């Protein structure tokens, strides 16, 4: 049986009501990336950053996985260990839909961790009323468990191994702008995978698909 690896981006969650980053009316409109999605921005103004991510977390709780999320779950149920899913999304909709072999490379909106002792928490365990939530263990500042610009994504070693060994690489709803994910298709093709792109608009890395 062929091994299938899927990569999803913000476009797959648009039908659920999650606004995509770069569309008109998207989450980045009227906000500077460096202010709300960088370590430097968090150091400058943690209140602003937490305000942004509390809004995103609340939005993610108000929506449901859509038919595209469910289709990938069914594909996984059919293929078993021959299917794996990488997502750039942090909305947790794949996990809520039932995806098991899942790599959330940019983190999760429902998680945070202490900047000092590194203790991880689910958002539902935390008191989000303060402008800047604090660690229950050491009292220091918590930050959203999100990979910001300039930080290293999660699971890169595991993802590289999957890219080297997949037969089919499926790309769904991603702009092909954000690296390293935008370069995954090149790695997959280099190691012989067939690549399939599903997107409403031509992604920036279309030449490699």
Language model features with spans:
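Conserved catalytic core of sirtuin-type NAD+-dependent deacylases
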Residues: 1-209
């Amino acid at each position: 049986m062929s091994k299938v690896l899927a990569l999803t981006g913000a476009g797959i969650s648009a039908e659920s009501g999650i606004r995509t980053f770069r569309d008109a009316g998207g989450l980045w409109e009227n906000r500077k990336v460096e202010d709300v999605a960088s370590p430097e921005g968090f150091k400058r103004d943690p209140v602003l950053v937490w305000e942004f991510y509390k809004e995103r977390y609340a939005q993610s709780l108000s929506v449901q996985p859509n038919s595209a999320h469910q289709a990938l779950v069914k594909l996984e149920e059919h293929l078993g260990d021959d299917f794996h899913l990488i997502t750039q999304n942090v909305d947790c909709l794949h996990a809520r839909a039932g995806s098991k072999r899942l790599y959330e490379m940019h983190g999760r909106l429902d998680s945070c961790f202490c900047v000092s002792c590194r203790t991880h928490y689910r958002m539902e365990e935390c008191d989000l009323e303060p402008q800047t939530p604090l660690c229950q263990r050491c009292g220091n500042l918590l930050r959203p468990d999100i990979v910001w610009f300039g930080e290293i994504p999660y699971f890169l070693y595991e993802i590289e191994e999957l890219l080297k060994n997949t037969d089919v690489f499926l790309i769904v709803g991603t702009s092909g702008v954000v690296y390293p994910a935008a370069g995954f298709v090149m790695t997959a093709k280099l190691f012989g995978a067939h690549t399939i792109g599903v997107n409403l608009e031509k992604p920036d890395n279309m030449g490699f698909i």
